[in-house]
Amino acid sequence: MAPARTRVNSLNVAVIGAGAAGLVAARELRRENHTVVVFERDSKVGGLWVYTPNSEPDPLSLDPNRTIVHSSVYDSLRTNLPRECMGYRDFPFVPRPEDDESRDSRRYPSHREVLAYLEDFAREFKLVEMVRFKTEVVLVEPEDKKWRVQSKNSDGISKDEIFDAVVVCNGHYTEPRVAHVPGIDSWPGKQIHSHNYRVPDQFKDQVVVVIGNFASGADISRDITGVAKEVHIASRSNPSKTYSKLPGSNNLWLHSMIESVHEDGTIVFQNGKVVQADTIVHCTGYKYHFPFLNTNGYITVEDNCVGPLYEHVFPPALAPGLSFIGLPWMTLQFFMFELQSKWVAAALSGRVTLPSEEKMMEDVTAYYAKREAFGQPKRYTHRLGGGQVDYLNWIAEQIGAPPGEQWRYQEINGGYYRLATQSDTFRDKWDDDHLIVEAYEDFLRQKLISSLPSQLLES
């Protein structure tokens, strides 16, 4: 579906969050001539990518009254995907400037480089002027076909405002999910969620069990092998007989999921192996969490399914006045944020027409039924994975944008394959240099960069 008509509306829009999703949402909304206020509880842009050495006093982050630390970034974190495919389409994630030694020019750079990229993006498009820093949104609710937004700044001063629309970009890496294992409530050792992991020092000479073997699980388990006595990874995606020593370390083992844990400190795996452990690290993901949102029960979060949402973005009965950017995972995040933001901005201006509420609900119901028929758990509702190409290209079609570049999709597929097959070396060894060249030639052709990087010219 191509854009339906020329722009007709200029609205007052609240954006919640100034991370990677909120920044590009603000830019696209302003491009559609909307007036934008971005609410950000931190003192700077970047959201998830703003590192702090601080962690929460409750290591599992289960206490609802705890002091919340919003970052989940650990000190050694590097990106899981190549930088070429990570960035926004018209602001590529290339080293800026090339000769600045304070920047990380690696293909899989550190979290500090990602934050610097987002700061560059905000500076380039003059987005900071739209942001209210140190301001937390405490309530969002519909009011007379508009939206009431109540916020509170760091001085404790509250403010009530009315907006035509609200775009939720608050991220989903703050409210941890923990593993449910028989006996774990009475297990005597220490437990911590990856949300509160920063550096490995606390695990010196310990036997550590890490639950989860994707992204943070793979990273953290290898990060602590340098100080821990033993590290054992448990994963429910592994067959029940799984037991192997992983390459690249002499004290790292991969297991099937935990069968049970016991008051004497032992942990029994489904493969029959028994370990006497000191600490369990839960690398088990996060919950979608919108404590400020009151829709009178229309929007619910059940087993990590946020709904009902049309194409993961619009609640049919409240669209386009309420929208969500960035819920899907296992995808090209920044690129998806950009496409979703363009769609939301165009729908609010009237340049793109959404289907009727009834048709959107039909599509939501059909999507849920399809996933259930394939036996996919509800908690995977927003997991794109192999469906991301169709999803991203579909949104691009709605706004009249070209589909995603083939090199971009090939890079993410290759990146996930290397992550799964060479978790100890995937960030520093690859076999797709031709895709790097293709990406940079594309940037050059679009005049997004002025020249090819020196390392490409030398190759």
From Swiss-Prot:
<dbReference type="GO" id="GO:0046885">
    <property type="term" value="P:regulation of hormone biosynthetic process"/>
</dbReference>
<dbReference type="GO" id="GO:0050661">
    <property type="term" value="F:NADP binding"/>
</dbReference>
<keyword id="KW-0503">Monooxygenase</keyword>
<comment type="similarity">
    <text>Belongs to the FMO family.</text>
</comment>
<feature type="binding site">
    <location>
        <begin position="17"/>
        <end position="22"/>
    </location>
    <ligand>
        <name>FAD</name>
    </ligand>
</feature>
<dbReference type="Pfam" id="PF00743">
    <property type="entry name" value="FMO-like"/>
</dbReference>
<dbReference type="GO" id="GO:0050660">
    <property type="term" value="F:flavin adenine dinucleotide binding"/>
</dbReference>
<keyword id="KW-0285">Flavoprotein</keyword>
<dbReference type="InterPro" id="IPR050346">
    <property type="entry name" value="FMO-like"/>
</dbReference>
<dbReference type="InterPro" id="IPR000960">
    <property type="entry name" value="Flavin_mOase"/>
</dbReference>
<dbReference type="GO" id="GO:0004497">
    <property type="term" value="F:monooxygenase activity"/>
</dbReference>
<dbReference type="GO" id="GO:0048444">
    <property type="term" value="P:floral organ morphogenesis"/>
</dbReference>
<dbReference type="InterPro" id="IPR036188">
    <property type="entry name" value="FAD/NAD-bd_sf"/>
</dbReference>
<dbReference type="GO" id="GO:0004499">
    <property type="term" value="F:N,N-dimethylaniline monooxygenase activity"/>
</dbReference>
<keyword id="KW-0521">NADP</keyword>
<dbReference type="GO" id="GO:0080107">
    <property type="term" value="F:8-methylthiopropyl glucosinolate S-oxygenase activity"/>
</dbReference>
<protein>
    <recommendedName>
        <fullName>Flavin-containing monooxygenase FMO GS-OX5</fullName>
        <ecNumber>1.14.13.237</ecNumber>
    </recommendedName>
</protein>
<dbReference type="InterPro" id="IPR020946">
    <property type="entry name" value="Flavin_mOase-like"/>
</dbReference>
<keyword id="KW-0274">FAD</keyword>
<keyword id="KW-0560">Oxidoreductase</keyword>
<comment type="function">
    <text>Catalyzes the conversion of methylthioalkyl glucosinolates into methylsulfinylalkyl glucosinolates. Specific for 8-methylthiooctyl (8-MTO) glucosinolates.</text>
</comment>
<dbReference type="GO" id="GO:0019761">
    <property type="term" value="P:glucosinolate biosynthetic process"/>
</dbReference>
<dbReference type="GO" id="GO:0046620">
    <property type="term" value="P:regulation of organ growth"/>
</dbReference>
<feature type="binding site">
    <location>
        <begin position="212"/>
        <end position="217"/>
    </location>
    <ligand>
        <name>NADP(+)</name>
    </ligand>
</feature>
